[in-house]
Amino acid sequence: MSVDMKLNRAQFDAVMVPNYAPAAVIPVRGEGSRVWDQEGNEFIDFAGGIAVNCLGHCHPALVNALKTQGEKLWHLSNVMTNEPALELATKLVNSTFAERVYFANSGAEANEAALKLARRYALEKHGVEKDEIIAFDKAFHGRTFFTVSVGGQAAYSDGFGPKPQSITHLPFNDVAALEAAVSDKTCAIMLEPLQGEGGIIDADPAFLKAVRELANKHNALVIFDEVQTGVGRTGELYAYMGTDIVPDILTTAKALGGGFPIAAMLTTTEIAEHLKVGTHGSTYGGNPLACAIGNAVLDVVNTPEVLNGVKHREQLLRDGLNKINEKYHVFSEVRGKGLLLGAVLNEQYQGRSRDFLVASVAEGLMSLMAGANVVRFAPSLVIPEADIAEGLARFERAVASIAAA
């Protein structure tokens, strides 16, 4: 390979599998909430790598953890345990409802583990007939065949042949539908406390109460997918902490590594004991390099200063978006929680969320979609107020360009 090979967007099409359609911009450097591309153009990051970069880019604490552990020990496999993994598991246990932790590398893997555990728990405790998983329309739980089938979006799961069975999808926040569906055959109810890919839709308190009560009544487990909402994103360490219920199993990834691949499944001792030696595993899960960074992330995020700061920054971002909307009238509402917000396009602009992303990039702002009708924002939890203000100014210019077209 030539050392002077030009690495550009065209090269992606030449060498990569075409399952992504990345922008023409290729970032090469990031610091805090700002990113620079190959041409030196600067962007403010309101996307956060899809709610991953919870401390922005190249946070000093994470860089230090990476360098320090990188000079000690990289990988072992689970033939042996390691100190960073034990430390991180202990922090997660001490900070949540959980008593046991399983490490993986991605949200999909953590969710796969959660679903397998729920099935095995039900099989061993109640028999083979108790295998139904109840999930919800517009949910997203990952891209493995099991998780994508449990996620309630046919666009992601169709086209791969026969799907895993005994999965029931219901409308999100529909208590009556839930009451009609849950039975003694239900082994688990899986949901996001705030649907991300589905459009930034918060779970109603009454709905969550029904989920917990029906699960208890029918000896089913409640699985919270907190891959996107976890590690401070909503202003709580985990979103369930801002609700009146506690799940039986929780999955976490994305922000847990602040940009380094790591995930975990959290549960109780009584449930965890059903994953005996050899029933599940991951070669990289609990990798000391990943866990060292995860420890650094929790040390920074799990503090009153950062978690309270998320709620303050939410208000700044929400107020700014509403102020833009007062002028241009493009959104029907701004919804979400903490620093996971969605600006819902009104009837005139339905289906055009990608247009807003493209216009934002042209103005030097990175944002996200949550479906065709929602512009999603998931910036760093510690984004400076000046960057929020400048990002909003750039977004307003993007909105103005679309409104004037």
Curated annotation (Swiss-Prot):
InterPro entries linked to this entry: Ac/SucOrn_transaminase_bac (IPR017652), AcOrn/SuccOrn_fam (IPR004636), Aminotrans_3 (IPR005814), Aminotrans_3_PPA_site (IPR049704), Class-III_PLP-dep_AT (IPR050103), PyrdxlP-dep_Trfase (IPR015424), PyrdxlP-dep_Trfase_major (IPR015421), PyrdxlP-dep_Trfase_small (IPR015422)
Enzyme Commission number, as recorded: 2.6.1.11
Keyword Metal-binding: no
Reactions performed catalytically: N(2)-acetyl-L-ornithine + 2-oxoglutarate = N-acetyl-L-glutamate 5-semialdehyde + L-glutamate
Biological-process GO terms, alphabetical: L-arginine biosynthetic process
UniProt entry keywords in alphabetical sequence: Amino-acid biosynthesis, Aminotransferase, Arginine biosynthesis, Cytoplasm, Pyridoxal phosphate, Transferase
Compartments where found: Cytoplasm
Pathway assignment: Amino-acid biosynthesis; L-arginine biosynthesis; N(2)-acetyl-L-ornithine from L-glutamate: step 4/4
Cofactor binding: number and manner: Binds 1 pyridoxal phosphate per subunit.
Known cofactor(s): pyridoxal 5'-phosphate
TM spans (from-to): none
GO cellular component: cytoplasm
Binding-site list for pyridoxal 5'-phosphate: G107, A108, F140, D225, E226, V227, Q228, T283
EC main group: transferase
HAMAP family reported for this sequence: ArgD_aminotrans_3
Family: Belongs to the class-III pyridoxal-phosphate-dependent aminotransferase family. ArgD subfamily.
Assembly information from the UniProt record: Homodimer.
Record's protein name: Acetylornithine aminotransferase
Source organism (scientific name): Shewanella oneidensis (strain ATCC 700550 / JCM 31522 / CIP 106686 / LMG 19005 / NCIMB 14063 / MR-1)
Classification lineage: Bacteria, Pseudomonadati, Pseudomonadota, Gammaproteobacteria, Alteromonadales
